C-alpha cells in the first residue's frame, strides 16, 4: 500500500515537472474565457461578448501573435459556458486558473457575474477588465479590487444621459415635459430608474406614469396602454432585450406616438433595426457609438467580415476595446507577469476602437449613455466626456 | 373592455402554451419537462422557414405540426415506452419520466444552440393594427388567439365526440380499467404524447410571430404550462383553456389597474388559491 502511494506521488511529481517544463517553453499565450452560452443572458452574450473575443483572437494570431519581450506569442483561447450563473462562473474561473493555468482571462459577461467573480479574479491576481458591467458601485469596486477596470460606466451616467437627451429635445421644442417611466424589476432596471427619476425631475420633467414589471415579461400591452392613457410627451423604459422588442412592437400597434421613445438594452442590437425597419428610426436606447470615427468604421467592417454579423452599437465595441487594452498592456509590459501587466494598464493611455482610454483609477470615465437610430445608424446622442455626439431628433409617428 | 380583450388574447396565448402538455401529462402520463424546448424549437423552425423561404408561419404549421408529431411519437416509442413498461406504479413512472425528459431538455437545448446560436431571435409577421371596439391590438395576437380557439374546439370534438377520443379519455381516467374494456392503452398513450407534441409545436409557431425567443428560454414556457395544466385539472383540455383565460385576464387586469410589477404575484396567488380549494384543479376529478 505504502509503495503504491509513493509510486503515485512519484508519477504525479514527474507529471508536474513535465507540465511546468512545457509551460516555461511555451510560445503560446493561454487566455481563458467564461461567459454564458446558455441561460437567460446567453442571448446578449451571443451578440456582444463571444463574437468580439473571436474577432480579437483571430486578428492577433493573423498578425503573428503578441510581442511579449522578444517572443512572438500566439493566443490560445479556452472557453467555458457559465450557464448565466455565478456559481458556474466561479467554478470555471477556478478551473482556468488552477487546471488550465491560463496566462490571462477575459472578463465574464454581465454586471452580476462580474461582481460575483471579482474577488476570485483578484485572488488569482489576473487583470480584470470588465466591459459589460454598469453599476453605481463602480468607484467602490475599482478601489476594492485594484486589479479591476470598469469600462462601461455607471448606471448614473447612463440614466443621466437620458435626462440630458430629453432636455435637449425639450429645449428644441420637440417635446413637452410629461414623461412615462417604466423599468424591468431587476438590479439593472432598478438602478437606472433610481438614478434616472431624480435626474429627470431635476431637469424639470414631470413623471406622469411610473411602473415596473417582472423580468421576462413579454406581454406588455397593458403597460403601453396605461402609459398611453397618461398622455406623456416622452416614453422611457429601462428594459432588457425581449421586453425592449415587445414594448416597441406594442407601442407601434397601439399607435402610442411620443416625441421621444427610449427603450433599454437591445435597442442598439442590429436585430432591432432589422426587425422594425423604418419604425426604428428615431428610437433611442442605452449606449451608442461614434459611428463616424474612422477607427470605429474600420472595426464595424472587420467585425462583419470575421464573425459574419454586425456588432451591437454599445458594449460590443467596448468588449473589443477591453481586449485591445489587455493586448497592448501585455506588449508594453513585455512579460506575462500579471502584476506588471496590471501596472501597465493603470499607466495608460490606450488607443482603442472606442477612442483613447485612460484607466488611472480603474474607471473609464468617458462613455456613451444614449444612442438613437438615425437613418440606419445608432449614433451616440448623449455621453459623459466624449465628443462626436449627434443631436437627438424628434421621433416621428409610427407607421 | 380594453383590459378584458387584452386579457382574453393573452389567455389564448397561454392556452397555446399549455394545451400540449395537458395531453402529454394527462393522458400519456408523462410529465414532459422538455415541453418548452419543443415549443422553442417550433419557434426557431418557423423563424427559419419565414426568413429563408418566406413561408408564412400559418402555412408553416402544416409542416411543423406533422414533423413534431412524428418526432414526439419516436421519442415516446424509443425513450419513454421502456419507462412505461417497467414502471410498477404511477408515482414511479412520474419520477422516471421527469428524469428522462429533464435530460431531453438539455439535449434539445444543446441542439438548438448548435443550430441557431444563443442570440435573441424575432421577426415581424402581422404586426399590424387590428381594431376591436375602437382600440388597437396586434393582428398576430388576434390570429394566434383565433388559432388557439380552432385548435381547442377541434381537440374537444376529437376527445368528446369521437370513439377514439373517448378511448383516449378513458386512458386518462384509469389506464388499468381501460385495458379491461379492450382499449390499446399503449397506442392511445403514444398518440396522445405525439399529438401533445404537435400541439405544443403549433403553439410555438404562432407565438414566434410576436415573442422574442432564444435557445435557452424553453423552461419559462414549461413553467407557465405546468401552472395552467395543474390549475385546470390534469388531463382536462377544457380546464386548461379556462385556466389560461383566467390567468390572462387576471394578469392583464392587475397590470393595467394595479401595477405591472404584481402580475407574477397575481399568477401565483391564483395558483395557490386553486390548490387550496380545488387541489384536483378546476375540472379535475377527485382521486378515488
Question: Language-model features: where?
Answer:
Chain B
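Single transmembrane alpha-helix segments in multi-pass membrane proteins
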Residues: 1-51, 78, 84-90, 233-234
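Pore- or pathway-lining transmembrane helices of multi-pass membrane proteins that form conduits
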Residues: 48, 84-112, 218-230, 260-275
Amino acid at each position: 500500500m505504502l509503495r503504491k502511494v509513493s509510486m503515485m506521488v512519484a508519477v504525479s511529481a514527474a507529471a508536474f515537472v513535465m507540465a511546468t517544463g512545457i509551460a516555461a517553453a511555451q510560445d503560446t499565450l493561454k487566455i481563458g474565457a467564461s461567459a454564458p452560452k446558455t441561460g437567460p443572458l446567453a442571448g446578449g452574450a451571443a451578440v456582444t461578448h463571444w463574437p468580439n473575443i473571436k474577432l480579437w483572437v483571430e486578428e492577433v494570431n493573423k498578425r503573428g501573435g503578441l510581442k511579449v519581450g522578444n517572443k512572438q506569442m500566439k493566443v490560445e483561447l479556452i472557453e467555458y459556458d457559465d450557464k448565466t450563473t455565478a456559481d458556474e462562473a466561479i467554478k470555471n474561473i477556478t478551473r482556468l486558473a488552477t487546471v488550465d493555468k491560463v496566462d490571462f482571462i477575459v472578463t465574464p459577461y454581465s454586471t452580476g457575474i462580474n461582481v460575483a467573480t471579482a474577488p476570485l479574479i483578484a485572488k488569482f491576481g489576473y487583470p480584470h477588465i470588465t466591459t459589460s458591467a454598469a453599476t453605481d458601485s463602480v468607484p467602490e469596486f475599482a478601489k476594492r479590487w485594484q486589479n479591476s477596470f470598469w469600462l462601461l460606466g455607471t448606471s448614473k451616467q447612463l440614466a443621466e444621459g437620458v435626462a440630458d437627451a430629453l432636455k435637449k429635445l425639450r429645449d428644441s421644442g420637440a417635446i413637452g415635459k410629461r414623461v412615462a417611466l417604466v423599468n424591468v424589476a431587476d438590479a439593472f432596471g432598478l438602478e437606472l430608474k433610481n438614478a434616472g427619476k431624480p435626474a429627470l425631475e431635476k431637469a424639470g420633467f414631470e413623471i406622469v406614469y411610473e411602473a415596473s414589471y417582472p423580468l421576462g415579461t413579454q406581454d406588455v400591452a397593458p403597460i403601453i396602454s396605461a402609459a398611453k392613457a397618461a398622455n406623456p410627451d416622452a416614453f422611457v423604459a429601462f428594459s432588457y432585450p425581449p421586453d425592449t422588442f415587445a414594448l416597441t412592437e406594442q407601442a407601434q400597434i397601439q399607435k402610442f406616438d411620443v416625441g421621444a421613445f427610449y427603450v433599454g438594452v437591445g435597442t442598439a442590437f442590429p436585430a432591432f433595426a432589422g426587425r422594425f425597419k423604418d419604425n426604428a428610426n428615431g428610437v433611442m436606447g442605452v449606449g451608442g457609438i461614434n459611428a463616424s470615427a474612422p477607427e470605429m468604421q474600420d472595426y464595424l467592417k472587420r467585425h462583419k467580415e470575421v464573425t459574419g454579423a454586425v456588432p451591437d452599437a454599445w458594449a460590443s465595441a467596448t468588449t473589443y476595446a477591453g481586449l485591445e487594452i489587455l493586448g497592448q498592456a501585455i506588449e508594453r509590459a513585455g512579460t506575462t507577469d500579471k502584476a506588471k501587466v496590471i501596472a501597465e494598464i493603470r499607466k495608460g493611455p490606450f488607443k482603442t476602437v472606442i477612442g483613447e482610454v485612460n484607466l488611472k483609477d480603474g474607471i473609464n470615465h468617458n462613455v456613451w449613455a444614449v444612442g438613437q437610430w438615425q437613418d440606419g445608424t445608432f449614433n451616440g446622442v448623449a455621453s459623459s466626456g466624449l465628443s462626436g455626439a449627434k443631436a437627438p431628433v424628434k421621433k416621428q409617428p409610427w407607421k | 373592455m380594453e383590459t378584458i380583450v387584452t386579457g382574453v388574447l393573452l389567455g389564448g396565448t397561454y392556452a397555446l402554451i399549455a394545451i400540449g402538455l395537458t395531453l402529454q401529462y394527462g393522458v400519456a402520463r408523462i410529465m414532459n419537462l422538455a415541453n418548452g424546448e419543443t415549443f422553442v424549437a417550433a419557434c426557431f423552425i418557423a423563424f427559419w422557414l419565414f426568413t429563408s423561404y418566406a413561408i408564412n408561419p400559418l402555412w408553416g404549421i402544416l409542416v411543423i405540426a406533422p414533423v413534431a408529431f412524428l418526432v414526439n411519437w419516436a421519442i415516446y416509442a424509443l425513450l419513454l415506452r421502456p419507462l412505461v413498461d417497467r414502471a410498477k406504479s404511477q408515482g414511479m413512472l412520474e419520477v422516471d419520466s421527469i428524469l428522462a425528459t429533464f435530460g431531453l431538455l438539455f439535449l434539445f437545448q444543446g441542439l438548438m444552440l448548435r443550430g441557431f446560436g444563443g442570440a435573441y431571435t424575432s421577426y415581424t409577421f402581422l404586426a399590424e393594427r387590428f381594431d376591436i371596439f375602437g382600440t388597437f391590438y396586434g393582428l398576430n395576437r388576434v390570429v394566434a388567439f383565433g388559432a388557439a380557439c380552432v385548435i381547442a374546439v377541434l381537440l374537444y370534438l376529437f376527445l368528446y365526440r369521437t370513439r377514439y377520443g373517448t378511448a383516449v379519455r378513458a386512458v386518462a381516467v384509469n389506464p388499468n380499467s381501460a385495458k379491461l374494456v379492450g382499449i390499446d392503452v399503449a397506442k392511445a398513450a403514444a398518440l396522445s404524447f405525439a399529438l401533445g407534441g404537435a400541439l405544443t409545436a403549433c403553439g410555438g409557431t404562432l407565438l414566434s410571430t410576436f415573442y422574442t425567443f432564444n435557445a435557452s428560454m424553453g423552461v419559462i414556457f414549461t413553467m407557465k404550462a405546468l401552472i395552467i395544466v395543474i390549475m385546470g385539472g390534469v388531463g382536462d383540455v377544457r380546464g386548461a383553456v379556462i385556466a389560461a383565460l383566467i390567468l390572462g385576464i387576471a394578469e392583464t387586469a392587475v397590470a393595467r389597474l394595479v401595477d405591472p410589477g404584481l402580475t407574477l404575484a397575481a399568477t401565483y396567488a391564483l395558483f395557490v388559491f386553486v390548490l387550496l380549494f380545488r387541489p384536483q384543479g378546476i375540472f379535475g376529478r377527485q382521486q378515488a
